[in-house]
Amino acid sequence: MSSSISSLASAPTLSTNASTSSIVDQLVQAYVQSISTPVYNMQAQVSSINSTISVYQMLKSTLSNLQTQASDLSQIGTLSPLAAQTVTSSDNSVVTATAQPTATAGTHSISVSQLAKSDTLVSNELTQSGTSISTATGAGTFTFSITVNGKATNVNVNVAAGDTNSTVLSNIASAVNSSGAGVTASVVNDTSTTSRLVFQSTNTGSANAISVADVTGTLLQNVGWTSSVISSRTASTSTGAGYVNTSTSTLDANFTLDGIPIVSGSNTVSNVLTGVTLNLAASQASTANPVTLTVGPDTTAIQTTLNNFISKYNSVVSTLNTDITDTTSTDSSGNQTVNRGSLAGDVSIMNLQMSLENVVMGQVSSAASGGPTSLSAIGITLNNDGSLSISDQSKLNSALTSNPSGVIALFNSSSGVATQLNTMLQQFTNPGGVMDQKINGAQDQVTQMNNMITSMQQSINLQANAMQQEYSAYESTLIQLSQTQSNLNNIWSGMASSGMAV
């Protein structure tokens, strides 16, 4: 019997502690992995749909850019960017000009005999360090008025006893410049010891002739601007007060346009030729040849507009080609894999691609009589990849110069290229349009799938927790059994050592 006791005492103990916990964790993790496959698959689907959403958003952006360009080109009349006009001058040193789309093409002759000038009023020459002004006026605040273009402005100037002429002139200039009277005042040091006060009208022309008068005191009178000097527009001299231009008529620009004499108070003239602004730069001798102004289509600006249109159209084509075309890749072993386009099989997108090609390749039934009826007629053709390019620059240049209205109608008439594109693309890019429907539908799908993923993960977590608890209970039982075994082993060992028989 002692041998039996010895056998019991030496029986293997039940395994517990850290090794059991590790095994339990591994079992639970393996179980979670085995039932998480649907979650992983759905997460992959969500990632794929999100990629598709990004593709839709990028496509919508490129379509919107083209739609905006098409909308501009479909504008009627002078609103069309293709109606841009320009003016060339045979002598830019005499006159330049700019044109709005409302300008009428044609040639004009202009001769400039006099430029518009600002009115200039100059004071007496005064010794800078002298006190003749302050001595004559005495100390105090003095008011004078400045009248320009029918508006009188009162100006107040403080004079202190003993102020030098330099100080008084500076104070007058400062007060005038902050008055908003339409006059710029400055002090000119004509010698090292003398100065003169100068008033100059801000704007040119006889309407802006300067008139000044003392209101209180004799401040202006003491710089030489007496009432007689002002009323008679006395000419200034090297030392005496007066006007640089004694006649107000010399303040206006004088020119002839197409033989018609014109007087303007400004050298910038925008009310003579419709849509044209003249910029007079220099007067001419009476014997000089007239300057020729030519108004016509701004081919440079129009070319830029057409290039922008082609660029935006080609961006759409490039995006569509990438999104709906399957590609084939070959690995190092020569195995080929077909990569499906992100939007391959999307019928509405594929139809859009075909519709775009039909518009830019088709004939425009509403084209102007005698004008181009297709893009190819002005040198713009379709390439093999569906993109547009200017294949014949000379043909385009000829169309822009010989029939600009026909080119405009090719785009903006009722069935014009831009009109058709604008109508078509609005269906895709407008709020709630095709692209928004696709994006919103895909986003709703992602939301639903994410909710399902959350629900499945919660279920998996519950199952994992239940399994963890079950194994924990099993481990607790093992610990109790192990303790019982240990106690029994101790008892049997004690009995065996005392020689007790059982």
Regions found by a protein language model. Give the residues of each.
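Alpha-helical coiled-coil heptad-repeat register
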Residues: 43-46, 50-53, 57-60, 67, ...
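Secondary-structure transition/capping residues
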Residues: 60, 77, 183, 324-327, ...
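Bacterial flagellar/type III secretion structural subunits and associated motility module proteins
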Residues: 1-47, 68-196, 200-320, 342-459, ...
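Acidic/polar N-terminal loop/beta-strand segments that form early-domain functional surfaces
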Residues: 52-54, 59-62, 87, 113-115
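Acidic/histidine-enriched alpha-helical segments
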Residues: 190-195, 322-342, 466, 487-498
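C-terminal low-complexity, acidic/polar tails when present
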Residues: 367-372, 473-501
